[in-house]
A protein has these predicted regions:
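Active-site loop-to-helix "anion-binding N-cap" substructures in soluble metabolic enzymes
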Residues: 1-396
Length: 396
């Protein structure tokens, strides 16, 4: 399915002020960027604009500020420094977003210059999509480019606002993300195996529903598996469960059966008596979880079962871990699935969020076909929802 919006290639950017929303929401430790994936992802569009002598104004959020003003630990300065380090470009930074200092910094730009504005969320009006915010941001540019796929599902001031006042185009990352994620579901090479993990059925109900309509096999892991176990009549001890969603999980199992879609649930689990770094794991079958134990990971038989299903796939979509992979003693299930996907001769799409963290943790990022930079945005696209940020752009 071809991308239906105009991209930066369609714009005349020569000498123009290009206001670009990027996703520099990167993890920081002691003021240093610990994972630069999102900064790297924005570079192709930035490079293109620089080569075409645009005056480039970059804006992003970082973290969850309280919206009452400057918070030094959530400043975008480290992201601006990382961009300079990765590209070798001179990157200017201004400790202001909507005020006089920002306006002066924009006015001083020459063709080819790059300026990063301070965190857009230091003002609470950003999240409310306040028109005043949008108007201020739009006043900095002649053209608006959206390349922040990770926030394209949010109707917020810096994401959709400028498009009301400026001609709005997609950046290369946004185009590639939407193209990749929509085409895989429109016409996947089969067998198509979807792997969904994570803690809650409730947060991924739309995705699961959509996958039952398009996948040949649906593999379920993580905390959500225990709600499905309850639908099958198993007891799950003190495992994470959503009792309000048991009936819905049961309906999904029936729907999959009626459609001839194979749903794979864990046959064994690694359980522990409490949730903590010092917790010790033991393996039990899925229908024999003791009352005082909680599921923390899929067990060894399940790891083999899932790896076998993945091995035969031509297309794999993966979103969500198989267990508490942040703790090494409960990481084996997620690692096994990750390695099976990496070793498989398939088109592999990693759907953002914790799956990306897992792929990076196990050093397998270069073995995947496409790693999405969006968690929530990927999921909404997979569900078939329109993304407000994309909708606001000019039609091709």
């Amino acid at each position: 399915m071809a991308f239906t919006k105009k991209t930066v290639r369609d714009a005349d950017v020569e000498g123009k002020r290009v206001l670009m929303r990027v996703d520099f929401n990167v993890p920081l430790k002691d003021g240093v960027v610990t994972d630069d994936t999102r900064v790297r992802a924005a570079i192709p569009t930035i490079q293109y604009l620089k080569e075409h002598n645009a005056k480039i104004i970059l804006m992003s959020h970082l973290g969850r500020p309280d919206g009452t003003g400057f918070q030094p630990e959530l400043s975008l300065r480290p992201a601006a420094e990382k961009l300079a380090e990765l590209t070798g470009f001179d990157v200017k930074f201004v400790e202001d977003t909507y005020g006089e200092k920002a306006k002066e910094a924009v006015d001083a730009l020459q063709p080819g210059d790059i300026l990063v504005l301070e965190n857009v969320r230091f003002d609470k009006r950003e999240k409310k999509n306040d028109p005043e915010i949008a108007k201020t941001l739009a006043s900095y540019g002649d053209i608006f480019v959206l390349d922040a796929f990770g926030t394209a599902h949010r109707a917020q001031g810096s994401v959709v606002g400028p498009a009301a006042y400026l001609p709005a185009y997609a950046g290369f990352l946004l185009e590639k993300e939407v193209d990749t994620l929509t085409s895989i579901f429109a016409d996947p090479e089969r067998p198509f195996v979807a792997i969904v993990g994570g803690s809650k059925v409730s947060s991924k109900i739309g995705v699961l529903d959509h996958l039952i309509d398009s996948a040949d096999t649906l593999i379920i892991g993580g905390g959500m598996a225990y709600t499905f176990f309850m639908a099958k009549g198993y007891t799950v001890g003190t495992s994470l469960k959503e009792e309000d969603w048991v009936e819905r999980a049961g309906e999904m199992l029936k729907k999959a059966e009626a459609k001839g879609v194979k749903i794979l649930l864990p046959v064994d689990n690694v359980v522990a008596d409490h949730f903590g770094e010092d917790a010790k794991g033991e393996v039990v079958d899925s229908d024999k979880i003791p009352d005082d134990r909680m599921g923390m990971d899929i067990g060894p038989k399940t790891r083999e079962l899932y790896a076998e299903a993945i091995k035969g796939a031509k297309t794999v979509f993966w979103n969500g871990p198989m267990g508490v992979f942040e703790m090494d003693q409960f990481a084996a299930g997620t690692e096994a699935v990750c390695r099976a996907v990496a070793d498989s001769d398939c088109t592999s799409i990693i759907g953002g969020g914790d799956s990306v963290a897992a792929v990076n943790k196990f050093g397998l990022a270069d073995k995947m076909s496409w790693i999405s930079t969006g968690g929530g945005a990927s999921m909404e696209l997979v569900e078939g929802k329109a993304l407000p940020g994309v909708e606001a752009l000019l039609d091709a």
